[in-house]
Regions:
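N-terminal secretory signal peptides
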Residues: 25-74, 79
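Short, compositionally biased
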Residues: 103-119
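Loop/turn positions that initiate beta-strands
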Residues: 90-91
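Well-ordered alpha/beta subsegment
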Residues: 118-142
Length: 142
């Protein structure tokens, strides 16, 4: 009796760790704004899968509130893991109520509801402090 139960627990643990490993690796994305190139890791969720299916994708992003670059899709993307949370500089998020795809480049410590985390830019996000509205291209990194 003890061995089958232990085997079942070990199997469940292995599944959990493999899922975490896949999520931790994520999807590598190349982001280009003007002549600046950044890399990001996008998380595996429904929102990300919907976005990546459209790559390569160039979006006219608007500088909003001195903290974020934003593009509003005409139609909603799936967002089944939204939450109220803060954000970090470099986060790439989707704000479900206005179909907003957002790069957070400055911090104001606001907590935002209905936020779906999409990914994280590794470095260089500070360039958006000086670009104003700009076309940004998203594609798979090689």
């Amino acid at each position: 009796m003890f061995k089958p139960v232990m085997l079942a627990l070990v199997s469940l643990t292995a599944v959990s760790f493999s899922s975490l490993g896949a999520e931790a690796e994520g999807i590598r994305v190349k982001i280009t704004a003007g002549d600046q190139v950044m890399t990001a890791t996008f998380y595996d969720n429904a929102t990300t899968r919907a976005l990546v299916s459209r790559f390569p994708l160039t979006l006219p992003m608007e500088d909003l509130y001195g903290r974020e670059m934003c593009y509003r899709f005409p139609d909603a993307l799936p967002a089944n893991e939204t939450q109220t949370s803060g954000y970090e500089v470099g986060d790439v998020v989707y704000w479900a109520p206005r179909h907003s795809f957002v790069i957070m480049y400055e911090q104001n410590n606001e907590r935002i509801g209905n936020l779906q985390k999409v990914g994280r830019i590794h470095s260089g996000v500070g360039i958006f402090r000086h670009t104003g509205n700009i076309d940004v291209t998203f594609e798979m990194a090689h």
